[in-house]
Amino acid sequence: AETFVRLSDEKNIDKITVKDIVEACGISRQAFYYHFQDLLEVIEWSMEQAFGQLLDRSLQEDDPEIVLNDFIAASENAAPFMQKLFRSQKREQVEWLMARCVRSYLQELISAKGKLPRIPYEDLDIALNFCTYGFVGLLLECCDKKKTVDRETMARQMYRLLQGRIGEADPVRA
């Protein structure tokens, strides 16, 4: 996966082949296919690893604003590679993978933190979908190199939104 990211610095993502990866890694095609079915699975594995690491850090933190700030920072750090993926023919699949990873991240975080009141599954499902696509939209915005993001402000705004307090004055700016 790291080799794929490195190769994306040298050539267009749509032009990277399994042959390029196996040559750069010094492994056989058989070894590649033992671990991955195709290049999209490499991207998927890479995203799952990144969100897994983010989840581990998030579970160690008690302050939701810091968790959100870390989430935004991770998005900014991944932005150069994500921009390349979004300009590729794989954009639609990458957006779907991102939504799946974000939803899994949120579900695991909620489950581990146990901070939600008992709500019916259908309500939790719609809340997860709503948050997932809101977060993915913000991630896409963070990946837009033309837009600069104030992480701390965005984290506060997201936290107030999740608490249903978005219309209230920002205590930091007041």
What are these regions (language model features)?
Residues 46-53, 78, 82, 104-113, ...:
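A short secondary-structure junction motif
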Residues 58, 82-86, 113, 142-146:
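Secondary-structure edge/capping motif, primarily at the C-terminal ends of alpha-helices
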Residues 18, 40, 65, 95, ...:
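Short, structured helix-loop boundary elements
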Residues 65-80, 129, 137, 152, ...:
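Amphipathic alpha-helical segments that line or abut small-molecule/effector binding pockets
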Residues 21-43, 74-77, 81-85, 89-104, ...:
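Basic/polar phosphate-binding segments, predominantly the helix-turn-helix DNA-binding elements
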Residues 1-5, 9, 14-18, 23-26, ...:
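An amphipathic alpha-helix adjacent to DNA-recognition modules
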Residues 69-70, 91-116, 122-137, 163-167:
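Amphipathic alpha-helical packing segments from all-alpha helical-bundle domains
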